[in-house]
Amino acid sequence: GEIFGEMATITHSPRSATATAKSTCRVIALDGSQFQKAIQQTPTFALMLMSIMIDRLRLTLARLTMQKALPDNVVTEERRVFDESTLDEIIAKLGNPALLRYNRGKSILKIGEAGVLMYLPREGRVTITADGRTLEHVGVGGVFGEMALVTRAPRAANAVAETDCALIAVNRTQLRQLVQSNPAFGLSLLKLVAQRLQAVTNRASK
């Protein structure tokens, strides 16, 4: 009932680990096209994979924090997940909600808080931090806060408005509806989580 090898398939990058059969086993193998088809046919599959990768990311971040080894600027480049037209489409599907506005320096999320929303910046830029370290910067087209929303676990990082910003807020029910109505949305979000996990793992190994 578990899964492995998904990282390379999602990010189209080389394998970063070795898998060895410790006993006689049978596995279901999916190539890239089959994997994409599975997500399109069963969008909630993307949420399940996201939950697995987020748990791995949380464990890695917790271990690095305990060891006082969490690197600064874990994600070195700002990742744009959605373009302008996709953001407009998301807003329309959400019923054109009012954007949440935060002034520069204002706290948006704090470690340990319940994760009832994830956010997509429509204007401005947000800084994500943990243990006094900057993990990444999220601008227009990016996403943050999805980890706690998907897994229903407490927030694992802080988020502060780096500039004045306007955010699209998405709750868990809306997230599921977006994934089910637009599999490409789920796949893009899944790829983002995979890239974050890959970035943390790569930086931790240096």
What does each model-identified segment do?
Residues 2-206:
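Cytosolic regulatory regions built on CNB/CRP/Popeye-like sensor folds
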